[in-house]
Amino acid sequence: MRQLEHYIDVGQKRLRCGYTTGTCAAAAAHAASCKLLNGQAPDVVMIETPAGIDAVIEIEEEGCGKDWASCGVRKDGGDDPDITDGMLVVARVSYVDEPGVVIDGGEGVGRVTREGLDQPVGAAAINSVPRQMVTSEVEAIAHDCDYDGGLRVEISIPAGAELAKRTFNPRLGIEGGLSVLGTSGIVKPMSEDALIASVQLELRQRHAEGAKDILLCPGNYGWDFARDELALDLKRGVQCSNYLGAALDYACQLGFSSILFVAHIGKMVKVAAGVMNTHSRVADARLETMAAHAALCGASRELVAQVMASITTDEAIMHLKEAGLLKETMASIMEAVAKQLRHRVGEGLQIEAVTFSKEHGLLGKTAGADRLIALHATG
């Protein structure tokens, strides 16, 4: 298995990145399309990832029939401690009558059984960015081979059903296998010490550049919302991953004047409960917290039970919205967020928060958030 030679340096550590399952699926689909359309699969495939990093991936196995071809690659997780490292990801490409590229999941790829996830109920748990990557690779090969007919791509993970039992997929409403994931195409190492150190490094850099007011987001969802929906300048921003508490503590040490925290509701509702490391292995409490605040706002026992039984925060929001209690519940949650954040940072700086969901948009702000939004606005 050819390894990705892309590293990130954190302090004295040099950590190697890996590929997402989405990148593996795209590479396998690329090779299988070559095998089907011109009779020869390449030994290696180069994929340009959304992160702008070229991934050169070995093709480990291949097969073919009269109207189909398949190829597989092994996932390279880099220095990330991931149960999917080394697993085989296979793409089977076949001819279909309908034009375009149709993508589905086969053995070991989960099926969506509940609403509120990236894909609709009944679809294979292959998220949007991997689908785009697979489609792009297959269309490029079809174009090179002067083929303008339809193609079906089935992604399978032979070990996926067993590995999925060790993930949160069953609880999330994804049954029968793993999800094919990735927004950047690259897996960055998840060493906790290294991640916290990298967050601290970015905070030091912003401080050294003269920034007094800092924007914090857990990851890409918050980053994109801050830029696209709030029109914020990200130059004074730092992604803190799940380590909000560590980021706040260090920001206080550096002496920033204010912090604006922008996060998806799935992260923010944990903060309302005082959870400052939002990784799922540390704590959850999302639905319990939403249910408690709904009850404080007058929710019926039935509605509280619906919130508690939800699979995702978006599903819980839907129930609150239908009951006409979303606005009051979010105001209560954001008041709790404000108290938790101010307790963590003390009186030395102003801290405010904004939360949202991809499905419902802006959901809530703390009382002084608009002032900090104006400070970070572009233009």
What is each stretch, according to the model?
Residues 129, 312-316, 366:
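Secondary-structure junction/capping motif
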Residues 2, 6-9, 16, 172-178, ...:
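A structural signal for small-residue-enriched, beta-sheet-centric alpha/beta enzyme cores
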Residues 114, 164, 225, 270-272, ...:
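Generic domain-boundary/flexible-linker signal
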